Regions:
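Intrinsic low-complexity, intrinsically disordered or marginally ordered coil/linker segments
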Residues: 1-83
């Protein structure tokens, strides 16, 4: 059984971007609200969607944000390479 993976991309006041992946039992808005609150509103959601075959696609209905496609995919790959 494959688990569907979602993501939200955040931007800070300096313009730096961060991508967070999470399982499908959470909504995009639940994850984003938690991150924004924990960061004292330092981070703001700018895109969201799903990860399919290593690519960022789709949209977040609960956040009313679309995937930025290749831009989010490159950020995801960069994040994974930093581990």
């Amino acid at each position: 059984m494959d688990i569907e993976i979602k993501y939200v991309t955040f931007k800070d006041f300096r313009g730096d971007e961060y991508i967070i992946t999470f399982p499908s039992y959470m909504t995009h808005s639940e994850l984003a609200e938690s991150v924004v609150e924990l960061s004292d509103e330092f981070l703001k959601p700018i895109s969201g969607g799903f990860i399919e075959n290593g690519e960022c696609v789709g949209e977040s209905i609960s956040l009313n944000l679309k995937s930025r496609g290749e831009q989010d995919t490159l950020l995801l790959k960069k994040m994974r390479n930093q581990r």
